[in-house]
């Protein structure tokens, strides 16, 4: 039987979502699979909606897995969470259709990036906020970001290690707003390239400080040259909010579009 899980995690202590082999360091995937396998008393492999890098967090990562073990969804949720470290929790578990796929059934994916914008670095939230001491104009950043909307080649914002066959993605929404001392960027797209959100944020920061004009983001997009764009923003400010699926899959409302 196939199940879908909603998983929350603090990525600070992990080398990313993906299991990288015996000597690749701790991963969220390996940690979750070990807990699920313990509940099932059999090996379990999971497939996720979107992989995250080292230090990046997950608010509602969606995974699917198959198991013949006779467990109720509540049993999977509570039993697995009891076997996980404090940094990982299963938020929900539901039966899924046999043809549901956590990655390929998703219609969109959403990320949030938060910057603490003040002179003094964060102490309490240093693992979940990035930090920029220079004053940022969030409205200028928001205006500049609108140039990225639509289906475009995001070559200027892809990592040099990106293994995607092409850089075309459909960016469906992007907002930048100030919430007190925090500047928050939210992005939704059909899919993302490696480091795409962090590279976009790194370039938007230069607009926010006034080092670059508002139309610079449009120029970068058209030029498709990663070497002239801004630096990659640090990982700790990034959260994978989660994917969005069509209602036909009957998943919880927070991941249904």
UniProtKB/Swiss-Prot annotation:
Protein's UniProt name: tRNA pseudouridine synthase A
Reaction equations catalysed: uridine(38/39/40) in tRNA = pseudouridine(38/39/40) in tRNA
EC number of the protein: 5.4.99.12
Function: Formation of pseudouridine at positions 38, 39 and 40 in the anticodon stem and loop of transfer RNAs.
Gene coding for it: truA
Residues reported in the UniProt entry to bind substrate: 111
Keywords: Isomerase, tRNA processing
Native species: Xanthomonas campestris pv. campestris (strain ATCC 33913 / DSM 3586 / NCPPB 528 / LMG 568 / P 25)
Source organism, top-level taxon: Bacteria
Residues at the active site: 53 (nucleophile)
UniProt GO MF annotations: pseudouridine synthase activity; RNA binding; tRNA pseudouridine(38-40) synthase activity
Stated family: Belongs to the tRNA pseudouridine synthase TruA family.
EC class name: isomerase
Biological-process GO terms, alphabetical: tRNA pseudouridine synthesis
Subunit architecture: Homodimer.
NCBIfam families: hisT_truA
InterPro entries linked to this entry: PsdUridine_synth_cat_dom_sf (IPR020103), PsdUridine_synth_TruA (IPR001406), PsdUridine_synth_TruA_a/b_dom (IPR020097), PsdUridine_synth_TruA_C (IPR020095), TruA/RsuA/RluB/E/F_N (IPR020094)
